[in-house]
Amino acid sequence: KVEEGLKAYSEYNILLDGNETSYYLWKAVKCQEIISQNSPIPAMKAVKSDAEIAGYRRAMVRDGVAMVKFLKWLIPAVEAGGETEISIDKKLTALRAEQDLFRDISFDTIAGYQEHGAIVHYEASPETDIPLKPEGLLLLDSGAQYQDATTDITRTIALGPVTDEMKHIYTLVLKGHIQLELAKFPDGASGTQLDALARECMWREGLNFLHGTGHGVGSYLNVHEGPHQVRMEYMPAPLRAGMTLTDEPGLYLAGKFGVRIENTVLIQDYKETDFGKFLQIESLT
């Protein structure tokens, strides 16, 4: 047991991360000294090996096949009637399950139609599930665990005619998504320094979103992985080549609809100049 091991260990000092260690385990330590600081493991894990990156590339192809099959099926199915937020979630999971090395979904799917799309972390239940109609927007945030990688993708899909307001909001989100994906930046920059790239076109119109623009993605591990993030709040973790990240700006109009566009991306070397090493972003999705 962990507790017994900590009580019995006394030869060297022990490093404990106060953000991740329970008070119960902390009090069980009987070593000479507790060094309280962030664990070095997440930062090392965040930079993916060549084998892990190759796994992402393979898994993204398979996940893309499932998504394309789903998108081909979706519109005719909605037009035929009978589909709901829950039923289309089950269909997408079934298509992913046909792919090699599929093990499970990587998180509970967010399938929000019309006003439900404006709820950032909406999850359909039997009580909230609504039928889909051949009109308006469906926000679909989903992912899978394959044995060689973890995926995370969001698409906002027009199920039929949409309003001019929907088109405008979608365009702003797409602009922000592209702006971040095209970024070139110094090695070691923080995600906070990049965050405004995805928001600037929205800020011009007095619009904003209140979630992070991007998070790390594990390799057949947690779909949300740190320590690096792209968000407005200061995040000191440096961005390095080999890190995976999401690019997912959005806009949400309460009671009306929401738009989010998300790819999983890879940070890569760009060039080295007299001013240092620079990085760029490649979409893996």
Report the location of each language-model feature:
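Active-site neighborhoods and metal-handling regions in enzymes and metal-associated proteins
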Residues: K1-T285
